From Swiss-Prot:
Family label: Belongs to the universal ribosomal protein uL1 family.
Keyword list, A-Z: Repressor, Ribonucleoprotein, Ribosomal protein, RNA-binding, rRNA-binding, Translation regulation, tRNA-binding
Its job: Binds directly to 23S rRNA. The L1 stalk is quite mobile in the ribosome, and is involved in E site tRNA release.
Pfam families to which the protein is assigned, alphabetical: Ribosomal_L1
Highest taxon of source: Bacteria
Gene Ontology molecular function: rRNA binding; structural constituent of ribosome; tRNA binding
Annotated NCBIfam families: rplA_bact (TIGR01169)
Protein's name according to its UniProt entry: Large ribosomal subunit protein uL1
Assembly notes: Part of the 50S ribosomal subunit.
Gene encoding the protein: rplA
Length: 229
């Protein structure tokens, strides 16, 4: 613990907490100040001046990062017949119907993404209390309720991320790993930032992005200047 505290202090000394860095500077600092002994994730966080209690100010969606996330996603698909076969051919890790519902209700959660065809949502809905709190419930807004299961599986395997503003207007997302080249992290960050800009509700007032930051799994938060993108 003492060693970790020393490493954290050393990392903090390299970051000016009063400064908002350019996206390139921030990415370089995030890599430099990471002291985890594993290939840590690089995460970005946005604090948005929105009121999610209003239906027209809720922000939620999905996108495919140009350079992926560096994480292998375990994809589960609820489908039957030809659609089940399409999901399997596309590389889904688990495909089924009621058998998967029973397995999940029994405590099994060894998957990262859940996709379903629209006709399967009646049985998937029974898993709301399990999947909902974990942000795993299929949703049309994130492209996880779809008839094109092959595309959904391929995107999930290829670097697709989902995002959602919480009650305080915070949005967080993983944009890669520390082992990524800096330019690839910058490209991913810029792609996600563009999505956040376009997601601004028409009814939002005042400064939309009140804070943007980047960090690693065990690193320090680094403020980013939104105008540098």
């Amino acid at each position: 613990m003492a060693k970790k505290s020393k490493q954290m202090r050393a990392a903090l000394e390299k970051v000016d907490s009063t400064k908002a860095y350019s996206v390139e500077e921030a990415v370089a600092l995030a890599k430099e100040t990471n002291f985890a002994k594993f290939d840590a994730s690089v995460e970005v966080a946005y604090n948005l001046n929105i009121d999610v209690r209003k239906a027209d100010q809720q922000i939620r969606g999905a996108m495919v990062l140009p350079n992926g996330t560096g994480k292998t996603q375990r994809v589960l698909v609820f489908a039957r017949g030809a659609k089940a076969e399409e999901a399997k051919a596309a590389g889904a890790d688990f495909v089924g119907e009621d058998d998967l519902v029973a397995k999940i209700n029994g405590g099994w959660l060894d998957f990262d993404v859940v996709i379903a065809t629209p006709d399967m949502m009646a049985i998937v809905g029974r898993l709301g209390r399990v999947l909902g709190p974990r942000n795993l419930m299929p949703n049309p807004k994130t492209g996880t309720v779809t008839m094109d299961v092959a595309k959904a599986v391929e995107e999930s395997k290829g670097g697709k991320i989902t995002y959602r503003a919480d009650k305080a207007g915070n949005v967080q997302a993983i944009i890669g790993k520390v082992s990524f080249d800096a330019d690839k992290l910058v490209e991913n960050f810029k792609a996600f930032h563009e999505v956040m800009v376009k997601a601004k509700p028409a009814t939002a007032k005042g400064t939309y992005m009140t804070n943007v930051s980047i960090t690693t799994t065990q690193g320090v938060g680094i403020k980013v200047d939104p105008s540098s993108f």
